[in-house]
Design a protein with these regions (language model features):
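C-terminal motif of bacterial Sec signal peptides marking the signal peptidase cleavage site
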Residues: 18-21
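Short helix-loop boundary/capping segments
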Residues: 132-190
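Bacterial N-terminal signal peptides that target proteins for export
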Residues: 1-10
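Ser/Thr/Pro- and often Gln-rich low-complexity regulatory segments
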Residues: 23-118, 122, 189-239
Length: 239
């Protein structure tokens, strides 16, 4: 495995782990909790190079880091009308999860939760992946790098990571950049830490907002989508 691929794999693993870290792995039952004290913890994440989107839904007692809950009838959760089954893991506790094809996921979706009193809470969101237009050339010369996107807001924010294949260099890692009118500019001076050769380029957009239709305890919706590219960086040709 090259350093580029190794570093990329580590960064993705760390990013995904951070989505679920610092939470309790204890498991309880929703029947033992006041319905108004249930916290909704919703996560949707996908990558361009993965064929599926993952929808992960958790219900907790004691806020975002509290005890995870198993839904007892008549409580249930549906995603776009399809009921989810409970699963569990040592790290995260109880959760409700499904995968959907990325190719057909663009657009509006609804998460429908029913509590023990049969009260329904519908949480709607829209999933819009972004793309590079046009794609990145195989070779880029040093200088200000300009990238153009579709699928972003007029002013949007992306997490940007650039890594090279040299173990001696200091990478540009996890910078946050503003994209204006679909245009991202990475200034030439920021490339000084990278050596010439293969460059791994990762871009992620994250949306993190409070639940709009939840209990008194509230909740959080986190949506994450990313893409990766590789190109060769070389010195600008002298005129």
């Amino acid at each position: 495995m090259t350093r580029t691929n190794f570093t990329a794999s580590i960064l993705v693993s760390i990013s995904l782990l951070s989505l679920f870290s610092c939470t309790s792995n204890e498991i309880g039952n929703i029947k033992d909790v006041n319905p108004d004290a249930v916290f909704f913890d919703y996560t949707v994440f996908a990558d361009e190079d993965n064929s599926d989107v993952t929808v992960n839904l958790q219900y907790r007692m004691g806020g975002k880091n509290g005890t995870s809950l198993v839904l007892d009838e008549p409580s249930k959760v549906l995603f776009d009308g399809e009921q989810l089954k409970v699963d569990s893991a040592k790290v995260t506790g109880a959760f409700y999860e499904m995968q959907k094809p990325l190719a057909a996921f663009t657009g509006k979706h609804v998460i429908s939760f029913t509590d023990l009193n049969k009260k329904e809470y519908n949480e709607e969101f829209e999933f819009t992946p972004f793309t590079l237009e046009p794609n990145i050339p195989a070779v880029l010369e040093r200088g200000d790098l300009v990238f153009t996107f579709s699928g972003l807001e007029s002013v949007d924010v992306l997490s940007v990571t650039l890594t090279d294949t040299s173990f001696q260099s200091a990478d540009i890692m996890n910078d946050t950049d503003t994209v204006r009118n679909g245009r991202l500019v990475i200034a030439a001076h920021r490339l000084s830490a990278l050596v010439n050769g293969p460059i791994n380029f990762q871009l992620y957009k994250e949306v993190d907002r409070p639940i709009k239709n939840g209990t008194k305890e509230g909740g959080n919706l986190h949506i994450r989508y990313g893409l990766k590219r590789q190109f060769e960086l070389q010195d600008a040709k002298k005129l």
